[in-house]
Amino acid sequence: MSTSKRKRGDDANWNKRTTKKKPSSAGLKKAGSKAERPSLQIQTLQHAGSTMITVPSGGVCDLINTYARGSDEGNRHTSETLTYKIAVDYHFVADSQACKYSNTGTGVMWLVYDTTPGGQAPTPQTIFAYPDTLKAWPATWKVSRELCHRFVVKRRWLFNMETDGRIGSDIPPSNASWKPCKRNIYFHKFTSGLGVRTQWKNVTDGGVGAIQRGALYMVIAPGNGLTFTAHGQTRLYFKSVGNQ
């Protein structure tokens, strides 16, 4: 009998012990810094119609972190910005001159960081210092040895285009068919982890002349003289940091 009473007493004492409560999921989310982190700002650059990009032999270089001063989402709110991610969506269309010939070419797109832009955007030849004999072969280009402290290639992507001596509006004869070729291609890239810090002068515009340090360029060059136009958009994800 005594043994059974002790068991009941032990059971009662065990049930009276306080158990630690697990923290609720709501408490964890509240304590976490990620939940309070502000979302990234977005700027979209559209190129279509009159604003399409013409890509000649030798390439083209455009500033893309063009954050003008203002209060909108795509504006910089402070004197410093950080660009984290970029999404690139374009259709590359071979121009009428390139379509006259049967050709294939490997083109290149770069994202190039410029530590000290100096008031104007450089040309692709300034960045890569290629000789005229390599103008048609951008896959062989390297950053100039003398300017490697200024220009840093953040990303490099290759793409292939083709022409067959015909333009897209040509109609084959009724007793023949033409194989499709890559005279019109879709080019998509999404990249993160860029960490491009830009320091701005005390001006309101977002041009290269407003940048004190840290410009970001998109450089595109056609391969083997297969020139084209680019139609689409670039989307940049960034933050305004530092002092106002």
Swiss-Prot record:
GO terms of biological process kind: symbiont entry into host cell; viral penetration into host nucleus
Region named Disordered: 1-39
Recorded GO MF terms: DNA binding; structural molecule activity
Subcellular location: Virion; Host nucleus
Entries under InterPro entries matching the protein: Gemcoat_MSV, GV_A/BR1_coat, Viral_coat
Predominant cellular place of this UniProt entry's protein: virion
Any one annotated GO CC term: T=1 icosahedral viral capsid
Motif (Bipartite nuclear localization signal): 1-24
Keywords of this entry: Capsid protein, DNA-binding, Host nucleus, T=1 icosahedral capsid protein, Viral penetration into host nucleus, Virion, Virus entry into host cell
Lineage top rank: taxon: Viruses
Subunit structure: Homomultimer. Interacts with the movement protein. Binds to single-stranded and double-stranded viral DNA.
Membership in a protein family: Belongs to the geminiviridae capsid protein family.
Function according to Swiss-Prot or TrEMBL: Encapsidates the viral genome into characteristic twinned ('geminate') particles. Binds the genomic viral ssDNA and shuttles it into and out of the cell nucleus. Plays a role in protection of the genome from degradation, virus acquisition and transmission by insect vectors, infectivity, and systemic movement. The CP of monopartite geminiviruses is absolutely essential for virus movement.
Name of the molecule in the record: Capsid protein
Source organism of the structure: Maize streak virus genotype B (isolate Tas)
Lineage: Viruses, Monodnaviria, Shotokuvirae, Cressdnaviricota, Repensiviricetes
